[in-house]
Amino acid sequence: MKYIGAHVSAAGGLANAPARAAEIGATAFALFTKNQRQWRAAPLTPQVIDDFKIACEKYHFSAAQILPHDSYLINLGHPVSEALEKSRDAFLDEMQRCEQLGLTLLNFHPGSHLMQIAQEDCLARIAESINIALAQTEGVTAVIENTAGQGSNLGFEFEQLAAIIDGVEDKSRVGVCIDTCHAFAAGYDLRTPEACEKTFAEFGKIVGFQYLRGMHLNDAKSAFGSRVDRHHSLGEGNIGHDAFRWIMQDARFDGIPLILETINPDIWAEEIAWLKAQQIAEAMA
């Protein structure tokens, strides 16, 4: 079964996120558990935690259908020790918030070497950052998102994702989230079913589908291989509809949150309905 949704706002309280997801016909959702552009946040109160859990139950969202995202400020591969510690502390806080909320996944961007350390050293720092957080939490999987490779961001090649996983001690609590826009911008073609087959065969060989814990379904304004991260609505960008139809009809993408981060929230309900319809089309074929 496919879990399909979008990254919804938690404005006004975390308990509003499940309601907003239900309003657009979603069977999955992503959210920030705190302001994504600030380092610090007030601790979660028992009331906030209870309200969120009650709302998830009310709208039938289990932890497997929810993909929280961490702060954009965090860089787990930071070349400067003091800044690295700040990121590690913030990441641990994000993991602990998920733990408190009963969530089992935390999606994050791996990090950037900022042109100051070697790529291999940065990847090792990211893996060690994950190890530090996993050692102090329970039940939450660290889900590494592939990047477009913009600037000095790492995680744009499957080999880089595999290298990070290789450095994580508890393999049962690390996974990846594949963003289709990022993959396309990084040079992984998705424009035809044949291209999708090839790209995901490569993913399966290098990373492994056992580590796939979520996806971001985004078309791309950016050109193929451009290393530029610019999302678009489904079918309106340079990837086109075929990739998303193909994903909906492949059982390897069952049971994980498939999250829209497309540019027009006003049509998320339509995009979710279209994605669901592709599943039905396959079932009837």
Curated annotation (Swiss-Prot):
NCBIfam families: nfo, PRK01060.1-4
Cofactor descriptive note: Binds 3 Zn(2+) ions.
Annotated binding of Zn(2+) 3, by residue: 182, 229, 231
Organism in which the protein naturally occurs: Salmonella typhi
Enzyme's top EC category: hydrolase
Function, in words: Endonuclease IV plays a role in DNA repair. It cleaves phosphodiester bonds at apurinic or apyrimidinic (AP) sites, generating a 3'-hydroxyl group and a 5'-terminal sugar phosphate.
Gene behind this protein: nfo
Keyword annotations of the record: DNA damage, DNA repair, Endonuclease, Hydrolase, Metal-binding, Nuclease, Zinc
SMART domains per record: AP2Ec
Reaction(s) catalysed (UniProt annotation): Endonucleolytic cleavage to 5'-phosphooligonucleotide end-products
Annotated InterPro entries: AP_endonuc_2 (IPR001719), AP_endonuc_F2_Zn_BS (IPR018246), Xyl_isomerase-like_sf (IPR036237), Xyl_isomerase-like_TIM-brl (IPR013022)
PROSITE patterns, sorted: AP_NUCLEASE_F2_1, AP_NUCLEASE_F2_2, AP_NUCLEASE_F2_3, AP_NUCLEASE_F2_4
Protein name: Probable endonuclease 4
EC number(s) on file: 3.1.21.2
UniProt GO BP: base-excision repair
Keyword Metal-binding: yes
A GO MF term: phosphoric diester hydrolase activity
Origin organism lineage: Bacteria, Pseudomonadati, Pseudomonadota, Gammaproteobacteria, Enterobacterales
